[in-house]
């Protein structure tokens, strides 16, 4: 019983080897087990001989086992060696074989029990323990070979144990009867013999259990139909005496029905779930009631182990897949199975399922589930219920069906996922294509805009010059600047008066919805100072909402040129207001939008500039709360009401109509905000970020927010939004749509960049007011558009309102935004016309841009020099401070920005115009940021330019 063999052989040798054994092996097994059991049986009769022969037999066994260990293949030889050893000993050898078998069985039993109970039995067999099943199997095979050869020669051959010397191999055959008799006697005595194997007293219990543990090989002769021993045959007659020493529930009957006895232990075993034997084990041992104690001990032990294993299986079954192999009747169980083919059958049965399930990993969940029920039924209930083989198979079929269903479902899911991925990829490709198209369109637009801008600038310059000539009063300050000042001054007047007359020209320019491009070119065409001055103001406004103003520029283009110039200056103030409101809105968050609406409405009354300052005060307070546009978005709504309240309160100052509008807008927005919130992540977020787009420069989020929001809106609408934006751009003659669309796409791209670049862009805008003014000039291109844009900006300085323009973009926002925009436009236009504060704001904006615009601010200020003075005085300092801080602050956080805004606003609060200037500065910075961002975004993405 060399240790080396057993561990490997244990799992297989008793159960698998025997089943796998060739007929000769089976014969040997049957012989060996008959010899083994016979030996056990004979042991009682032949204990004396066993004692005498046991020394020899054990020596032989050990030698045989060693040989077997060295050469499992030599098992046949070993069996022959046993036979030879028996042969030389004659019948004594046979008896010795029996003794050996008893000893070996004892050794095996002990070894098996040792394997199970190494603690209890740690003897010579401990070494053999790991091997014991295998050596047992091998020895059994060897002895079986000998015994079965004996049986083949004569099943009774060993029967003549009394004639140790006389019995020859040939004699063994005649002694089958004696053997059978002894077996019959020994059937009861097997346990006795096992118990009698007191030499291995350790294993008395072991011996019975171990022998029983060793599945008896199926009787080859019975399989052939030859076995004369009948029920007494030591070897398993599959249907008949399978039950082991203790007959199972109904000894032969359950098994034969389950599997034909010839089918062998496995079919039979499945028939009797091993649990069944437990019942019988506990029940009086089979007819050969060996000392009931031993049988009972076996039964109890067996039952305990079964229970343990059942509980283990229960515990492990969730993991059953992993532990299945250990859980399924393991080697230990097999040893039990050796006794109870039932166990073996379970092994065969469960392993089949196990194998199948292993092949079908997806079936596992079901399989484990099934197996769990299966085990409970078989193992736990088997104490009471005996499964017929059919049930497991039904379960198995069900399991297979479930597995198939599961597999199908998983395949379907996989297919769906693949389809989704494909769709995503397609969408992405389409988006990319659209972006490319948009870029191309943008390029075309920009080209057209440049051309138109050049034309418009020329026309505007001429017009502005004419207007300036006509408006010498306005031109007086601008005149020193000559073209530019006139244009700037003209712009304020234009805002007032030219808006009507030049609107026609703007209408012409309107044809150039890409007036933005013109405005950029106008930016380029600094020579076109007039438009440039406007543009700068607008730039603050438009740059605040570069995309808005760009959109508005196209819109404003639709407005008459002079009107556009006016609207530009207005739009700057609006933008300032809208930026303020948008800032507030950004601060307030999605509601801020409503605020931006309301604030823009209240700004729409002339006092609105003051109101924005008031709001600015209020706003700065809310903004900190709203500190981050994004963070504010949620909290913002509450602050929004305060601001709304402030707005409302200020609104009365400017005009209750504004308040009414505000109320309407608020209502719309209030209605909408839910919608926005519905869009909420994108909607309110984008709303605030859009309004935040003005705030973009303001808050870190600023561009990032606007880009986020625009990205959100575009991403939230995702493809649809993108297409909406793109088409919205197309849809809204206002390129603002396109700029909007660009903004989302650009914003998306710019999000990461925007945060970093916000400050940079602000700086760039400050540095490149000319560059921004072009965009802002685009915004100026549509002064009214910019006003509208301003309203949109307020609504969603960023895309949202633009989206509203493009009703497609954010429909939720759109409805509110459009209504708000319309209201705001109307409000703004009148209030804008009324307001010259916009110039002051523009002056403020210009201060924001830098002192560069201060000149224009001064000129622009001419309409409202007071504001410009206050604003410029404060604004230049504050803007200068803010410009740098704002860009950093915008980088650092909208809160900080808003706080400086508050401080500045508070400082400027003394002068509402100062506040307006600070707000306008902020807005200008924001607008500039926006314009720069938009420009950068357009250049980078060139997506938005959808013509």
UniProtKB/Swiss-Prot annotation:
Compositionally biased intervals (Basic and acidic residues): 73-85, 105-119, 160-185, 203-212, 391-479, 505-515, 656-665, 755-769, 819-836
A Gene Ontology cellular-component term: nucleus
UniProt subcellular location: Nucleus
Cross-referenced InterPro entries: Zinc_finger_CCCH-type, Znf-CCCH_4, Znf_CCCH, Znf_CCCH_sf
Modified residues (N-acetylmethionine): 1
Name recorded for this polypeptide: Zinc finger CCCH domain-containing protein 18
Residues the record lists as N6-acetyllysine modifications: 809
Subunit structure: Interacts with ZFC3H1 in a RNase-insensitive manner.
Gene (name only): Zc3h18
């Amino acid at each position: 019983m060399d240790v080396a063999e057993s561990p490997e052989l244990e799992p297989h040798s008793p159960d698998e080897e025997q089943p796998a054994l060739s007929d000769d092996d089976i014969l040997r097994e049957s012989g060996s087990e008959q010899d083994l059991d016979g030996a056990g049986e004979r042991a009682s009769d032949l204990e004396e001989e066993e004692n005498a022969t046991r020394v020899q037999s054990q020596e032989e066994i050990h030698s045989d086992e060693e040989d077997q260990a060295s050469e499992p293949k030599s098992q046949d030889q070993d069996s022959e060696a046993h036979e030879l050893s028996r042969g030389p000993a004659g019948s004594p050898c046979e008896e010795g074989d029996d003794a050996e078998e008893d000893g070996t069985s004892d050794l095996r039993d002990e070894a098996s029990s040792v394997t199970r109970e190494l603690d209890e039995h740690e003897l010579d067999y401990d070494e053999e323990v790991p091997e014991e099943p295998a050596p047992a199997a091998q020895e059994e095979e060897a002895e079986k070979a000998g015994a079965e050869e004996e049986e083949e020669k004569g099943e009774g051959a060993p029967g003549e144990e009394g004639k140790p010397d006389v019995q020859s191999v040939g004699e063994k055959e005649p002694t089958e009867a004696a053997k059978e008799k002894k077996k019959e006697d020994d059937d009861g005595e097997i346990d006795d013999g096992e118990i009698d194997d007191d030499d291995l007293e350790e294993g008395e219990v072991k011996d019975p259990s171990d022998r029983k543990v060793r599945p008896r090989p199926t009787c080859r002769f019975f399989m052939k139909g030859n076995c004369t021993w009948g029920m007494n045959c030591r070897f398993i007659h599959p249907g008949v005496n399978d039950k082991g020493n203790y007959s199972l529930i109904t000894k032969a009957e359950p098994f034969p029905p389950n599997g034909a006895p010839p089918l062998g232990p496995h079919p039979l075993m499945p028939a009797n779930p091993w649990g069944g034997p437990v019942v019988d084990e506990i029940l009086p041992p089979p007819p050969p009631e060996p000392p009931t104690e031993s049988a009972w001990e076996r039964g109890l032990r067996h039952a305990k182990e079964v229970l343990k294993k059942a509980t283990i299986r229960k515990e492990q079954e969730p993991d059953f897949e992993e532990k299945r192999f250990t859980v399924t009747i393991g080697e230990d169980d097999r040893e039990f199975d050796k006794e109870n083919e039932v166990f073996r059958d379970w092994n065969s049965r469960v392993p089949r399922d196990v194998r199948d399930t292993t092949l079908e990993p997806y079936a596992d969940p079901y399989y484990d589930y099934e197996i769990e029920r299966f085990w409970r039924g078989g193992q736990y209930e088997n104490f009471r219920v005996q499964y017929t083989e059919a049930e497991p198979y039904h379960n198995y079929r069900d399991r297979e069906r479930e597995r198939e269903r599961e597999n199908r479902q998983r395949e379907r899911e996989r297919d769906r996922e693949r389809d989704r991925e494909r769709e995503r990829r397609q969408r992405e490709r389409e988006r990319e294509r659209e972006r490319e198209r948009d870029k191309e369109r943008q390029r075309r637009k920009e080209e057209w805009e440049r051309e138109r801008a050049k034309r418009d600038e020329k026309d505007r310059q001429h017009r502005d010059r004419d207007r300036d000539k006509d408006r010498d009063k306005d031109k007086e300050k601008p005149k020193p600047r000559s073209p530019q000042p006139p244009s700037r001054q003209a712009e304020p007047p234009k805002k007032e008066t030219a808006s009507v007359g030049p609107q026609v020209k703007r209408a012409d320019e309107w044809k150039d919805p890409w007036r933005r491009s013109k405005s950029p070119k106008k930016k380029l065409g600094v020579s076109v100072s007039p438009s440039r001055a406007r543009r700068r103001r607008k730039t603050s406004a438009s740059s605040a909402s570069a995309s808005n103003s760009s959109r508005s520029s196209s819109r404003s283009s639709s407005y008459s040129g002079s009107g556009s110039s006016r609207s530009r200056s207005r739009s700057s103030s609006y933008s300032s207001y809208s930026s303020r409101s948008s800032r507030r809105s950004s601060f307030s968050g999605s509601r801020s939008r409503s605020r931006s609406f309301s604030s823009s409405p209240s700004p729409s009354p002339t006092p609105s500039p003051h109101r924005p300052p008031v709001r600015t005060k209020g706003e700065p307070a809310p903004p900190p709360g709203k500190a981050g546009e994004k963070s504010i978005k949620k909290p913002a709504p509450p602050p929004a009401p305060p601001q709304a309240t402030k707005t409302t309160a200020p609104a009365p100052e400017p005009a209750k109509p504004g308040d009414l509008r505000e109320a309407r807008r608020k209502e719309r927005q209030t209605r909408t905000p839910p919608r926005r919130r519905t869009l909420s992540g994108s909607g309110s977020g984008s709303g605030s970020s859009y309004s935040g787009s003005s705030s973009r420069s303001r808050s870190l989020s600023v561009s990032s927010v606007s880009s986020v929001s625009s990205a959100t809106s575009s991403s939230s609408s995702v493809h649809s939004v993108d297409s909406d934006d793109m088409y919205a751009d197309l849809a809204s003659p206002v390129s603002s749509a396109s700029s909007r669309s660009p903004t989302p796409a650009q914003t998306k791209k710019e999000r990461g960049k925007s945060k970093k670049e916000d400050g940079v862009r602000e700086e760039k805008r400050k540095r490149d007011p000319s560059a921004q003014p072009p965009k802002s000039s685009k915004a100026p291109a549509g002064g009214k558009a910019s006003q509208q844009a301003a309203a949109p900006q307020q609504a969603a300085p960023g895309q949202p309102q633009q989206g509203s323009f493009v009703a497609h973009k954010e429909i939720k926002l759109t409805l509110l935004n459009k209504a708000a925009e319309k209201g705001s436009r109307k409000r703004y236009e009148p209030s804008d016309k009324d307001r010259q504060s916009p110039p002051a704001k523009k002056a403020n904006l210009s201060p924001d841009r830098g002192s560069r615009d201060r000149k224009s601010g001064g000129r622009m200020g001419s309409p409202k020099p007071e504001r410009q003075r206050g604003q410029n005085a404060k604004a230049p300092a504050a803007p200068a401070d803010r410009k740098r801080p704002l860009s950093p602050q915008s980088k650092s956080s909208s809160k900080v920005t808003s706080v400086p805004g508050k401080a500045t606003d508070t400082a400027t609060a003394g002068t509402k115009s100062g506040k307006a200037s600070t707000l306008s500065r902020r807005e200008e910075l924001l607008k500039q940021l926006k314009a720069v961002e938009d420009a950068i975004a357009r250049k980078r993405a060139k997506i938005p330019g959808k013509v």
